[in-house]
Amino acid sequence: MVQNNESVFFVECDSYKESPSTSPIRLDDLDGNDAVSDQGLAFDGDVGITSQARVRNPRAQIFEDSNTDVVLHLDDLDMVPLNTKFDMQMEMGSPMAMPAETPPPVEPLKTKDLAYSSLAHLPSYFFEQTHFRIDRKCLLEMSKLRRNYLTISKQDALSCPQLHSRVAGGYLKPVKEKLFGIRHFLDLEESNTVNLLQDGNYMTELFNSQINIPTFKEFREDFEWCLKIIRDRSLSRFSEKRLQYLVNKFPVFQHLHSKEEMRQSKKVPHKDFYNCRKIDLNLLLSGCFSQWQLTEFIWTKLRKEPDRVIHQAFNGSHITLSQLFKVNFEETGQFFNGLKIIDDSFLEWYKVIYLAKYHLVNDEMEIHTGSHGKQLRYYLIAKTFLEFDNYINGEYLAELLKTFLIKPQEESKYQLCQLSVDFQFYLHYDNSDVDNWWMVFANWLNHYNIFSNNIRWNIRISRIYPELYHTGKVKNFQEYLNLIFKPLFNAENYLHKSLGPILLKFLSQVSSIDLCIQDTDNYIWKNFTAVSCLPKDWTSGGDNPTISQYMYYVYVNLTKLNHIRQALHQNTFTLRSSCSPTSMNRTSQFSNTLNFTEHTEAILNNFLLACGGFLNAENLWNAPPSLVYLFYLSQIPMVVAPLNSIVDSKPTMLQEQAPTGLVLEPSKPYKKNPFMKFFEMGFKISLSSESILYNNSYTKEPIIEEYSVAASIYRLHSADLCELLRNSVITSGFSSTLKNKWLGVSLASHDYFVENTGFVDKWYDCKPNTSLEHNVPIIRRQYRSSTLAGEWRLIIA
């Protein structure tokens, strides 16, 4: 097998260095003069080339790790060939690259800015005079522009004060409350509290202060400048080649270092996928429990309280539970069996009709006068069990949340979530002291004690200005914005004797505001009003403002709110947005001179204005390559829900009842989701279960199910899963104090590994090796860091 004058080297690499840390082991020395014949090789259908001898060679040299009791055999080590010029050329991504004769020495990981790394050791290939109509450095300028917008709006992590005291043990310490405010911790002792809310004059002056925010004209100019860059053909071809290179580079890394990754993972005691923190970043309140859980809960209530009054009609008549589930059915004296209570027909109606038409704007008069039979029954089921503002004050929904979400998460300790709730545009309430959604929802959470240390809240804002305008609830776009943000700018709401502390407590657990861009959004314009007009002047006959108008004015109000909350030493909010698949077929009305789709408009707005991340990130796959490449370079957080995207939404009879312009997305298989491609390239991506009610989940741990399905289909191993979990934690809305406990990272500068997220937040490792907290092998993090640094060096060369 091996000639006497040639040797194959097997090298054991140190966990924190890429260079060999031990002397090479010659295969000749292992064979010696033994006359035993070499073991042959055979082809196996599943594995490939495998040894005929299933038992490890007893003559193989054994290595003992001094730090642990792990015994390593030669078969457990990666085979590292001697470096050649060809190997270095392939690592650079081009066979024409001529590497330096003497490679630079490998230095230990130190804190440094990846965008401004030294270029002294780069080969001449990186400095080739390639003709670009637009310089590649414009990508760096776009990232700087993004950082400028986000720091102005106080969305960066450094602008968010700590809301938790120091963590004791492995559990979260409850947040302490007091009248007129909440005890806030800025890495100080518990006695150093801030109670600025007691001064009403200071509050009024603070809420009326002016902030220097880029004007709409300046934002529009920046948007069009960025659009011209990402549409450049040569830059698009360059970005496409780099993305393809990143996709192909990761499998090569795994083939060369998979055993070393496995060895490093095994060295971490008592830390694997199941006992690493995992956060669902976009779990919807409207679907946070499964179909069988909802059915089981309804049957329990039917058995225990069948005569409970759950609804009162406008004519004064009452409807009980037993009457609700006998509408339009013969009186047999028996209830229906099994899943017939919550079947696919109801779920389809709930998703297509109720959430789009009745959920956001409460108009019971319309449903009672225009609906009957099955549709009325479906409406009452949704209103009774899936809403917090109803005749029974949301008692059933609170019980569902506590039973199937909060209690299991608190018991598991390692599962957390960011729960997304829709902002509902109600204009009046029975309680005269409460005239806005914020206080009603906060009061509901407090009444049923739904606040949990394992849950943070996202507020979803829908683009339903046309519906509100045509029903007479708003007269212009400014009134639409006032419904959302005016209660938060009213100092009297915070000084309210009973509801003020409750509102503060709720806002302290809100992490982000999400702008939802959906297929059902009104698209057709009738009056082409100039987009540069002020929101108070936008009536436009009910035409829906562009995505950029929504994003900019939500950004402006969020910026003002964050400045106020930071001055009061309260947590700040981030902005997130999504994108619908059908927007690729819709031309944007935002620019008078440039032609582009709403798809590109939504993604570019997210890049410029949103720090919280990009939702439904599978839609990024069809974006311009330069924009996709920018998302990688800036390490913008992305959230995908592969299981939720394969739901079959074929047209049915409900399509006739759906809102005008609804386009149902065709079903697609799991592997069509580009999630794995994004992960291989190195995007800051994480998984979410999103809506458990629709994806046929039959387990009590849906986020575990989501990761398990991905691991089964893509054959992910421990390092892959733990890297995804770490992404979900570091990009979440939980405080940096908790991230320090869970991941060993801090915003304070250290001399160890540094990780940039969103091109705005720098997270520093607090010790040389943090694998004990998250079990991501250091060699995997080295690969991600060096690959990203190489791409940045190529950009600024």
UniProtKB/Swiss-Prot annotation:
Highest rank taxon of the organism: Eukaryota
InterPro entries per record: AMPD, Metal_Hydrolase
Membrane topology (UniProt): Single-pass membrane protein
A Pfam family this chain is assigned to: AMP_deaminase
Coiled-coil parts of chain: none
Transmembrane segment boundaries: 627-647
The keyword Membrane belongs to this UniProt entry's keyword annotation: yes
Keywords: Membrane, Transmembrane, Transmembrane helix
Gene Ontology CC annotations of this record: cytosol; membrane
SUPFAM superfamilies per record: Metallo-dependent hydrolases
Subcellular location: Membrane
Family stated for the protein in its record: Belongs to the metallo-dependent hydrolases superfamily. Adenosine and AMP deaminases family.
Protein name: Inactive deaminase YBR284W
